[in-house]
């Protein structure tokens, strides 16, 4: 049974429209022949994600998302840590709405769980194209000016 959980550590939990997010994630997963199992999002600050990056991945830098893959066969399971600080600073640097960048990061982790990579230039280009397809799907569902966040 599909279950998507949202938690926060050191930040306020974004007011996620859970039903819409769940439907969107399920649609994206189904495009890759996958079903949603159990997914947990932990929204955090930069310091929390830096510590996790150091402890679990031996990386000494900030990042927007860390994805821990627990997938089984064709079922998507995983834990995703998202730094809202980095999402916000990336949105400013890219001149994007915060909500749009958060949507991209939310689905970026799901795409990793569906098997996409982003370590090489070719893989990164494929990831960006998949993100854009997923974001188009979202915009078609909720409208381009709307957000997955309650305002």
UniProtKB/Swiss-Prot annotation:
Zn(2+) binds at residues 108, 112, 118. GO terms for molecular function: metalloendopeptidase activity; RNA endonuclease activity; zinc ion binding. GO terms for cellular component: cytoplasm. Binds 1 zinc ion. It is an enzyme of class 3 (hydrolase). Its EC number is 3.1.-.-. Coiled coil: none annotated. Its main location: cytoplasm. GO terms for biological process: rRNA processing. It holds the Pfam family YbeY. Its cofactor is Zn(2+). It is found in: Cytoplasm. Belongs to the endoribonuclease YbeY family. HAMAP family: Endoribonucl_YbeY. Single strand-specific metallo-endoribonuclease involved in late-stage 70S ribosome quality control and in maturation of the 3' terminus of the 16S rRNA. This is Endoribonuclease YbeY. It comes from Porphyromonas gingivalis (strain ATCC BAA-308 / W83). The gene is ybeY.
